[in-house]
Curated annotation (Swiss-Prot):
Belongs to the ABC transporter superfamily. ABCB family. Multidrug resistance exporter (TC 3.A.1.201) subfamily. Residues 396-633 form the ABC transporter domain. Residues 1-42 are annotated as: Disordered. ATP binds at residues 431-438. It comes from Arabidopsis thaliana (Mouse-ear cress). Induction: Not induces by aluminum treatment. Pfam families: ABC_membrane, ABC_tran. The keyword Nucleotide-binding applies. This is ABC transporter B family member 27. GO terms for molecular function: ABC-type transporter activity; ATP binding; ATP hydrolysis activity. Probably involved in redistribution of internalized aluminum. May mediate vacuolar sequestration of a metal complex. Coiled coil: none annotated. Keywords: ATP-binding, Membrane, Nucleotide-binding, Transmembrane, Transmembrane helix, Transport, Vacuole. It is a multi-pass membrane protein.
Length: 644
């Protein structure tokens, strides 16, 4: 309704309504203790960012701690499998030495054939044992990885659900979805599957080097000359890649956020013919991600190309020197063959470790983003445990309440609001748009805490009341209610504590004037309403939301009337349902209808965060002030006198 929106309040401190006024609370904001657990305090709410966490791999691997027993068994299987794989070159070299002998007599030939057969049998046994251990290792580590990602996603989602509303004011939904899906998947691979492969390659490399020493210590030392150089290169490469990966994932999250927003607002996009614009915006962010990805690809390509060149030159050098030793009798052909096989196996393992290190650095970037949320402490405590005894009669009091949204701390919305809602009373909030009407409702619902002052329910501060108890006593019905993508029955029963009977659900729907249109659906109460209730009209969503509030039977009702978006019939049905909902309850209504204001016990006009006028409808008209002007303006803009 533009500047015709209204709000109620109580007595307030009067400091004037000029825009130049700056309240004294703002002077002390920097001195207030910061409730947020991050180093930047509430800075992440003001700027939309949280300081990235420094996450060691020990913390990532700790995610698999509940599966430690299975991973130990998997590690034992891994060690056995790695050892068996390295025994094959040893017996292969023995076969080469056997067939290289100078065999002259039939007895020697028979002896050689028996020796070869025995070696082949041993190799087959080694392969069978190694295959069984490899299968066992893969099963245990992969099953553990699935449990790791499930636990991580549950923990992350649980933590997100307990963040304060202000956190969601500044955080994009697409970014959170990216952390829940993509980042957790990367961490899953690092914590288990990649760990398995890393252990296998490390074990293979160490055991392989041991066998290389038994074959020729001279060749082994020559082969290990390149290791220090490669180690330094890998460390520097990994450090740079970790930062680049973190930046790439952040850019991808922005693109995901644009996509999520576009899908959620597809009707708005279509109504303005902005499909091409949204595609362009998404493409720009994808191109930014692509640019970073291509930079990463070039870096990885150069690194692995150099690594391959170093290994290849090392192998050529070792083989050349090995041939020299063989020619001069210091090694047998079989020993040289075994050594070459060992060196190739070790080289392959080290090369795989480099690849795994690259993946691990990407996981480190993802881990920073995930643990950044897991380490974040909500700036609002929900640890109150009081449940006021006696009749929950809905006595609400705002006492000298000051408030500024955490995302805009320099802009004070409420300036010393004091307001009393006596049990069973109906208080209408009216006033110019932006005055603070919705903010008052948000504070009573405890979506935010005031900077100064108190809000009491039945004489107890909201901050001391149990989170569950508070929201069973207070219910809110907004202009644009949000429904969940489930059945009508499930949506109505959503706020009910326990298992709601179908009879109770049906009665609530009847009181909300929703039963008739629900019964007209082919699936009746089993009808799925779609995401955010998009398959229903505005009036239908309103009435289901009213039925949901009726079923919870709150003692305090916060109501934001919605009339401008409804046709006359829907408006009548919704208003009639609201009248049923308000009966016998303490009601705070952000009023848009003249009929609502007339029947209110108290009307409060909120202007510039203060209560400018307060009284009944007739009392305020007699003042010839802001309220009178609002009524006159509405009457001039419409031939109907039913709305305000």
């Amino acid at each position: 309704m533009g500047n015709k929106k209204l709000l109620t309040g109580g007595s307030s401190k009067t400091h004037g309504s000029g825009s130049s006024y700056r309240d004294p609370l703002l002077q002390n904001q920097e001195d207030k203790p910061k409730a947020n657990g991050s180093e930047n305090g509430l800075n992440d709410l003001e700027h939309g960012v949280v300081e990235a966490a420094n996450v060691g791999f020990g913390r990532v691997f700790a995610l698999a701690k509940p599966d430690a027993g299975k991973l130990v068994i998997g590690t034992i299987a891994l060690l056995i499998g790695s050892t068996t794989n390295l025994l094959v070159p040893k017996f292969g070299g023995m076969i080469i030495d056997i067939v290289s002998r100078d065999v002259k007599t039939p007895e020697q030939q028979t002896e050689s054939l028996i020796a070869v057969r025995n070696a082949v049998v041993i190799i087959l046994l080694i392969v069978v044992i190694g295959s069984i251990c490899t299968a066992l290792r893969a099963w245990l580590f992969n099953s553990a990885s699935e449990r790791v990602v499930a636990r991580l996603r549950k923990d992350l989602f649980r933590h997100l659900m307990h963040q304060e509303i202000a956190f969601y004011d500044v955080t994009k939904t697409g970014e959170l979805l990216s952390r829940l899906s993509e980042d957790t998947q990367i961490i899953k691979n690092a914590a288990t599957t990649n760990l398995s492969e890393a252990l296998r390659n490390v074990t293979t490399a160490l055991i392989g080097v041991g066998f290389m020493f038994t074959s020729s210590w001279k060749l082994t030392l020559l082969a290990l000359v390149v290791v220090p150089v490669i180690s330094v290169a890998v460390k520097q490469f990994g450090r740079y890649l970790r930062e680049l990966s973190h930046t790439t994932q952040a850019a991808a999250a922005v693109a995901a956020s644009i996509a999520e927003e576009s899908f959620g607002a597809v009707r708005t996009v279509r109504s303005f013919a902005k499909e091409s614009y949204m595609v362009s915006q998404y493409s720009k962010k994808v191109d930014e991600t692509l640019k970073l990805g291509l930079k990463q690809a070039v870096l990885v390509g150069l690194f692995f190309g150099g690594l391959n060149a170093a290994f290849t030159l090392s192998v050529i050098t070792v083989v050349s020197y090995g041939a020299y030793l063989t020619i001069y009798g210091s090694m047998t052909v079989g020993a040289l063959t075994s050594f070459i096989l060992y060196s190739l196996t070790v080289g392959s393992s080290v090369s795989s470790l480099s690849s795994l290190y690259t993946t691990a650095m990407k996981a480190a970037g993802a881990s920073r983003r995930v643990f950044q949320i897991l380490d974040r402490v909500s700036s609002m405590s929900s640890s109150g445990d009081k449940c006021p005894v006696g009749n929950p009669d809905g006595d609400v009091e705002l006492n000298d309440v000051w408030f500024a949204y955490p995302s805009r701390p320099s802009h004070m919305i409420l300036k010393g609001i004091s307001l009393r809602l006596t049990p069973g009373s109906k208080v209408a909030l009216v006033g110019p748009s932006g005055g603070g009407k919705t903010t008052i409702a948000n504070l009573i619902e405890r979506f935010y805490d005031p900077l100064k002052g108190k809000i009491l329910l039945n004489g107890v501060s909201l901050m001391e009341i149990s989170h569950q108890y508070l929201h069973k006593q207070i219910s809110i019905v907004s202009q644009e209610p949000i429904l969940f993508n489930c059945s009508v029955e499930e949506n109505i029963a959503y706020g009910f504590d326990g298992e709601a009977s179908f009879t109770d659900i049906e009665n609530a729907a009847k009181m909300a004037n929703a039963h008739e249109f629900i019964e007209a659906f082919p699936d009746k109460y089993n009808t799925v309403v779609g995401e955010r209730g998009l398959r229903l009209s505005g009036g239908q969503k309103q009435r289901i939301a009213i039925a949901r509030a009726l079923l919870t039977n709150p003692s305090v009702l916060l109501l934001d009337e919605a009339t401008s978006a409804l046709d006359a019939e829907s408006e009548y049905l919704v208003q009639d349902a609201m009248d049923s909902l308000m009966a016998g309850r303490t009601v705070l209504v952000i009023a848009h209808r003249l009929s609502t204001v007339k029947t209110a016990d108290c009307v409060a006009v909120i202007s510039d965060g203060e209560v400018a006028e307060k009284g009944t409808h007739d009392e305020l008209l007699s003042l010839n002030g802001i309220y009178t002007n609002l009524v006159k303006r509405q009457l001039q803009s419409s031939s109907s006198v039913t709305t305000l």
